[in-house]
Amino acid sequence: MLVADDGAGIDLGGRRLEIRHTRGHADHHFCIWDEASRGWFSGDSFGISYPWFRFPGGDYILPATTPTQFDPQAYLESLAVLEAKKPQRMYLTHYSELEFSQDKAEQLRRQVLAYREMAPGHAQDKASLEAALADYSLGVMAGCGPREDEAALREMLAFDMDLNAQGLMVWQQRTGAGG
């Protein structure tokens, strides 16, 4: 086992990788910077982007606000750490490689901020929070160009909206946010 401090470097077959502690999604989370590819192995810190959410006008990326340690401010700070390297690509855990753009980072940042603002209005009603998150996500997707049937997209979002709503509710209970 290797315990890596924030900013630690690891030599992997002559290739230097930098470890950055990126809280927000979870306290234990870290990302790995690969200077050679100018890419981040971002885990869930740069969100989730399913292949079916890649549209002609752009990719839809949704934040991962899952329980139990989601912290919106730390998420935004971690996003800034990732952006500071001026990456060319992000290697997402869910799913695959994405070309980095400031627009994608801004899309993710706006969603985290919107989630943080939406959550208190649904503090005791997970179903209504899920619906609000899905409605918001569909609105963001609309900016990415032509889409499939909205009911099908809503169904594709359901699993993540459930997890994200749980994470937001746990965050509110843990911190007293919005209450």
Placement of each model-derived feature along the sequence:
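A short catalytic or substrate-binding loop motif that flags glycine-/basic-rich loops and adjacent residues
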Residues: L2-A4, R23-A26, F159-D162
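C-terminal regulatory/interaction regions
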Residues: G121-G179
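Metallo-beta-lactamase
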Residues: M1-R23, D27-F100
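Generic structural signal for short, solvent-exposed loop/turn connectors between secondary structure elements
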Residues: M1-L2, G9, R38, G121-L129
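Internal alpha/beta domain cores that form substrate/cofactor-binding pockets in large enzymes
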Residues: T68-K85, M90, L98-S137, E155-M156
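Generic detector of short, locally flexible boundary/turn motifs and exposed helical patches
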Residues: V3-G9, R54-D59, L133-A134, P146-R147
